[in-house]
Amino acid sequence: MVQTAPSIFLSAALIALAYLIGSIPFAVVVSKLMGLQDPRSYGSKNPGATNVLRSGNKAAAALTLLGDAFKGWFALWLAQMLAPGLSWTVFALVALAAFLGHLYPVFLGFKGGKGVATALGILLAIHPGLALATAATWVIIAVFFRYSSLAALVAAFFAPVYYLFGSGVAWYAQGPVGVALAIITLLLFYRHRANIARLLAGTESRIGAKKK
């Protein structure tokens, strides 16, 4: 599928396009279209699905989740449509660009979300089985421990592992994708640093817990 290198100009254009797609702030767009408060003004102030859910509108949160995941998948799909036979290196850079677009969106002054849904969309574009295994990991941890952040961190940690040991990855060719996934994992941990501190302190909110 992905095997040849496009021109430097085309590669740069695909990477830039992926960043712009990743920068689309679905949390803000969906909230505005549905007449809700800007998610950057309440809760964690994070423009993501979890914070939109704090508005009490589950439909808006679901649409935000789907939108954020879709842009991760779409950026990679579009790159492959525009440049058939895309090299693994450019493919990996496009994935990183889309993810960084969500974390540091040009449309929101480079202050974006944490990237969980967008990362899932990227995994789906790489391989549906990889996305399924990672999502299943999230669900298992969330059900047993009731911490959304912990589930995201554990799932993010295992995503590169699943990629490494799943479906006979040819590292001489597909290594850049594995490196990109490792970088995405590190960035996810960095964006969740406040959650990690609360988990260690025992003050992180559990899923379904009512605020006092």
Swiss-Prot record:
Keyword Membrane: yes
InterPro entries the UniProt entry points to: G3P_acylTferase_PlsY (IPR003811)
First-level EC class: transferase
Gene Ontology CC entries for this record: plasma membrane
Pathway where it operates: Lipid metabolism; phospholipid metabolism
Localization (cell): Cell inner membrane
Pfam families noted in UniProt: G3P_acyltransf (PF02660)
TM ranges: 8-28, 59-79, 90-110, 122-142, 148-168, 169-189
Protein's membrane topology: Multi-pass membrane protein
Annotated keywords: Cell inner membrane, Cell membrane, Lipid biosynthesis, Lipid metabolism, Membrane, Phospholipid biosynthesis, Phospholipid metabolism, Transferase, Transmembrane, Transmembrane helix
GO molecular function: acyl-phosphate glycerol-3-phosphate acyltransferase activity
Enzyme nomenclature, EC number: 2.3.1.275
Entry-linked PANTHER family: GLYCEROL-3-PHOSPHATE ACYLTRANSFERASE-RELATED, INNER MEMBRANE PROTEIN YGIH
Function: Catalyzes the transfer of an acyl group from acyl-phosphate (acyl-PO(4)) to glycerol-3-phosphate (G3P) to form lysophosphatidic acid (LPA). This enzyme utilizes acyl-phosphate as fatty acyl donor, but not acyl-CoA or acyl-ACP.
Family the UniProt entry places it in: Belongs to the PlsY family.
Protein name, as recorded: Glycerol-3-phosphate acyltransferase
Species of provenance: Bordetella petrii (strain ATCC BAA-461 / DSM 12804 / CCUG 43448)
